Every structure is written in C-alpha cells, then in structure tokens.
Amino acid sequence: NTEHPGLILGGGISQMDRPLGLVVKSKHASVRTSTRISSSINKRFLQYHQRSKSGVASAQRDNYIELSVHASYRNNVSRYMNVINRIVVAENVGDQRERMELLLSKLLEPTSSAEAALQLEAIGKDAVSMLQMGIQSSDPEVQFYSAEALAYLGEAEAAPVLTDLAETHMAFRWHALTALAGMDHVSALDGITELMESDSAETRYGAFTALWKRNPGSPLVSGMHYPGFTYHHVASTASAMIHVSMANRAEIVVFGNGIKVTPKQLIYAGNHILIKNEGSGKLQISCFTAGKPDRFATTTTNLEDVVRGIAKVGGGYSEIGDCLQSA
C-alpha cells in the first residue's frame, strides 16, 4: 500500500467536486417527503443553462436531496445552505403573507434583523418590497442585513448600501464584499471599484479580491503571470500599498504608482539572490547557485522592474517576499 495519511500544512484546494445535499431524518424519510422538499426548493431556486431552466434540487433517495449551488451563492455556499434550510415546505399564499408581515416587524428590530432577513431571502422575490423597507432604516444593522439579502436576490439597490457599510463598518466588510462579488449588476462593479480607493488597507484588498471573484479575467485584476505567482498593479489615488498574499493564491498586489526599491546596502532575496544598489536609479540582481551558471539582471528601482528582474534570474514568490521585507 503506497497510500499514507498526511497533513498539508499550507492548506490545499481539492480538484474533485464534493456533493452538496440535504439528509432527511429517518423518522420523516419517504419518497413523498424528499419530493416535496425538492419541489419547494426548486420553486425558489431555478438555474438557466443556455435556453433551458432547471431546479437546483433533485430527490435522489427517500432520505437524500442532492443540491447544485445557485450562481448567486457561488462565493458563499454556507449562506446558500442557511437560506435553503429556511424554505418552508408547501406553504400556502395566505400563511406566507401572514409570516411575511411578522418577519417585517422582526426585520426592523436590530436584535432579530439577521434571522428575519434570511427568512425573507428564502421566500424570494415576493419579499423584496419588505427588504427594501429595511434598507431605509436608520439602524446600520437593519440596513446591512436587508441589503445583503437583496444582493443575493439580485436587486441593484443593495449595492450602494453595501458599499457604504463596507467602508464605514468593519464588522460588515467581508460579508458586504462577498455579496457584492456575487451580484451581476453594474452597480456592484461600481461599488467594488470605489472601495479599491479606500483609505483602509483591508478594505482595498478586500475589494480587489471581490472583483477577482466576480470576474478573474477582468483587466483590472488579471495581472502579470510569473512561474508560481501573479503580480497585479492597481492604479489608485489612495496612498501606495503592497499586499503579499499569505493564503489562497500566490499574488502580489500593488496599489498606486511610484513604488521603488532603494536598498541602502546589499540585500538578500532568499539564499541565492543578491540585490545591490548601483546608484543612478539602477539595481544589480545576481543569483549564485552551486552547480549552475551565475545569472544577472540590471533593473530600475521601480518595483515592477525589480519583480521582473528577480523572476528573470530564477527567483520566485518567496524571494520577492524576502526582498520586500529587507528593502
């Protein structure tokens, strides 16, 4: 047996899709029950493939319903499951209307707003008008939970509210940006782009990540690809900033212009690369490795040129990180 258990210290990404589904408790399990549950879910969630549409739920057994992730929740599967679990099975119109009136009063109360917003989101488009009342509240919690639910329902008016709250309330930032990233409306793109000019370093990088999740092929976030990492430059009028990712993706994101590497003395980038300031805006980058020819590159002090030079002599992500820490 050549298989051995192990732990990937830096984490990893599975190359195989995991099934997503609901298990019906054994005392309630039946073909009729699983069919009714999947029917109620599909009444709320439909997906479109080219010219056809289909539900997200499929009753596979008497006690198991398989789910596909709706596109609106591609960045937040846990919320998707929270919403799925709040769908009421076989609810008639009169009962739903009564429940919505009760949920509206709870939505406008900060202590119960989060749960009420999720339940209204589970109802779907019929609950939009009530959530729109929520974003008119003077309370930021009520505003946020209402806007978040509206965002996952694809309503454009959620975007300006989430943009403002991501900037002004740290506690809402991640959830607001994640909701914006899942929206297809241009107002969400405008909001994310606006947040990339924020004075907050966390907000700026969070907005960059949201834009990448929304559209990795966008010219704003596509970057320059080197072996093992990606370098991004974001034109920004805010203060210059460099972000070196320590998780998920090997990437360097530079906000602003004019960032230079000007070491006062010789610095090391890893164990084999030396960077020397030659003066007059020039750097000499040298790589010495046993058993290999010495490699050299001359660059300007502009950060982008330095990154390119380190890559040219054989350096990678860790060497560039060392350079930035030492410079």
Locate predicted features:
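Extracytoplasmic/secreted envelope proteins and their assembly/folding machinery
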Residues: 34-38, 42, 62, 77-85, ...
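Amphipathic alpha-helical polymerization modules
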Residues: 53-56, 315-318, 325
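Short inter-helical turns and helix N-cap capping residues of alpha-solenoid HEAT/ARM repeat scaffolds
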Residues: 109, 138-139, 168-171, 199-200
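Amphipathic alpha-helical scaffolding segments comprising HEAT/armadillo-like alpha-solenoid repeats
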Residues: 93-105, 125-136, 155-167, 185-197, ...
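Extracytoplasmic/periplasmic terminal helices and flexible tails
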Residues: 1-106, 111, 115, 144, ...
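Long, low-hydrophobicity ectodomains and other hydrophilic envelope-associated domains
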Residues: 219-316, 323-324
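Structural detector for internal amphipathic alpha-helices that build alpha-solenoid repeat scaffolds
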Residues: 113-123, 133-134, 143-155, 164, ...
